[in-house]
Regions:
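An alpha-helical repeat/solenoid feature that recognizes helix-turn-helix modules
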Residues: 1-60, 64-194
């Protein structure tokens, strides 16, 4: 193994120890919830059971991607916004990867940021938790379901700040529909209570 390969291996291992196992691609060495949901869905559809180690190792990454401080106590630093500290919120929704949201951030009074939860990632999170064998009585699942109920819509991908950018709420709208449909199919729910 070359020094570069060894360094990359070390970075990946450190990320996994801190944030759990996920799936990603490209040169930046970090996984994301979008890719993870399809990897776990492929495992499930190939016959893997909820107790499969791949599902169980993914749980920590799912927790780190959820705005639920009871399971996500980590903080991160936002490279795009003057390296500001990013902490978990408590709305129960999900972000693209730990500390990062395509929907932007909310700045708290002390200057720290909370990555905004949004629809497509919250459905991806819920679907993955179900693949890993968690049920609706689990607080992580219940929090994601509560976010979905509070933010239910088929007009936009909820969670994006349309006041800042009127086009933002349409970001990934068809992807949102796909995530919503696949997730609700996994829950067995025919209706969402709002």
């Amino acid at each position: 193994m070359t020094v570069t390969e060894n360094s990359l291996h070390g970075v990946r291992r450190l990320w996994a120890e801190m944030n759990g196992y996920g799936i990603g691609y490209g040169n930046d060495l970090r996984p994301d919830l979008s890719n993870l949901q399809y990897a776990l869905q492929a495992l499930k559809e190939s016959g893997a059971k909820a107790d499969d180690p791949a599902f169980q190792r993914a749980i920590k990454f799912l927790e780190r991607s959820q705005n639920l401080s009871e399971v996500n106590r980590n903080s991160y630093y936002n490279r795009e916004d003057d390296n500001k500290k990013v902490v978990s919120g408590d709305d129960g929704g999900a972000v693209y990867y730990p500390g990062n949201s395509m929907a932007g951030y909310v700045e708290l009074e002390d200057g720290t940021l909370v990555a905004r939860s949004y629809g497509s990632m919250t459905y991806a999170l819920l679907k993955c938790y179900l693949f890993a064998g968690l049920d609706i009585t689990d607080p992580r699942v219940a929090a994601a379901l509560a976010w979905i109920e509070r933010n239910w819509t088929v007009e936009v991908n909820p969670g994006f700040n349309s006041l800042r950018d009127p086009r933002a709420a349409a970001q990934g709208l068809y992807y949102y529909y796909l995530s919503l449909a696949q997730c609700l199919g996994e829950t067995g729910k025919k209706f969402v209570t709002t």
